[in-house]
């Protein structure tokens, strides 16, 4: 007997491990064993399942639950049929292992009874024993169920919820309520703490499956309706919408459709005429016309070439200022600005940018500067190279007391020993432009100079007689002195034989001085000349001379046509004893300047006798011919 028990202990130790019935808390219920009597478990009639002893009914219930294999309540002889092929007799003959096995099963039985406490008392009574058997029957058949509540998935539950509603539509919160009320598993999981998981699963399934369609709610601030897809949709284990496989990927389907459209468009373009631009560029794969309608939507936001600003057909639509070819003659003025010995022209800013009234535009129609052509570039205007000169624009707003002269200063570099005025960028003030270092002239002066007994504007620009040109050159050749505040009188105001006399209306309260027949006005304030009634346009063929010690006096000449620019120098920058100064001490040898500075390079070759034809002039000015010819 001592050697006999040695082989069975391994069987005793292995047997519980191979028995799945000793795991009552397992999530997967075991299949029914074929050794069980089907009449005691599968029969739905109450008569066969009833046992005369209450203990036998309890044994049937526990055996149907597959929780226990042996118990103290039934005979060991009956256990033979239960054990079947196992050597149960040898196991029962071994007394020590039996109490241990029974103790293990008793503990498992107590755990099972605590789990099934509501159903065990009803199972112990003979009359109510069929009901737990019938209730436990679906559990045995639902061994392959996927969820804790049964075989129904979340999508199936949502479908039932929507179908159960009268309008066949539910909001998300209504679906939650239906789950809590209708499904027993969710009855105790309706609070916010325990419902986060399954509510998230419901939202996931609603957006995942194609059988659910979201409909916008009519009311503002309300959640959308969820309905079943009338066309039918896939549910259950259908492919997800976001799956990136080659079969159901939407991007891949679009790319295949795009390739088909591209192929069709290329074939149609080859069949059509090749003269049209669309048929030519559609053969290029990167062109917009070769893409599908989806890709072409990005091109629809651009304007076509025929309506773009870059097109030459549509005209100027860009905010860029037009060039000078579109401006009128009154807006473009060319100043004789000698950049070299042969190139004398320079373009001033348009006067429409400097003026701010309609009277200015009317005035500019008759006050245009004439541009010298190539045939007259060797005119006396080339003498302007010797010094910096100032162009004073005569346009000012008539009737505007605060308007000022617009002054633009230009200069030549490295030509004249005389102090030159540098090229300056003129800043913009409130009502006009002011050159740096210059002072404004009152607007009333220009108004009175341009009105009353002045000649008409169309007669202002008068060609200069050669005799006057020669006379002026003679005066310059005699080292004439021109004051910075002097005003050049208008020729044609009165006859002055053999000399140029001042205008009869020129009134100067200070000491006027006449040198070589030219009045020099020592004017402490230019505003005292408000009574002067004359035209400021004087035909002067000679160049302006800028005196270094007395400020700026300037005059522009353009091939015999000239305009006087009056520049006011403030009294403070002049010497206090200006009236007592001798003007003769400020000599300027123009001839030496011309000979030494202009003709030393051999490029400035001009003769005053043959420039202008003989023309009549209202003055009987007689003078000797004096000309310079480069040697």
From Swiss-Prot:
CDD domains: FH_FOXO1 (cd20060). Residues 1-11 have a biased composition (Pro residues). Residues 253-264 have a biased composition (Basic residues). The keyword Nuclease does not apply. Keywords: Cytoplasm, DNA-binding, Nucleus, Phosphoprotein, Transcription, Transcription regulation. Residues 37-48, 100-135, 265-282 have a biased composition (Low complexity). Transcription factor that regulates metabolic homeostasis in response to oxidative stress. Binds to the consensus sequence 5'-TT[G/A]TTTTG-3' and the related Daf-16 family binding element (DBE) with consensus sequence 5'-TT[G/A]TTTAC-3'. Main regulator of redox balance and osteoblast numbers and controls bone mass. Orchestrates the endocrine function of the skeleton in regulating glucose metabolism. This is Forkhead box protein O1. The gene is foxo1.
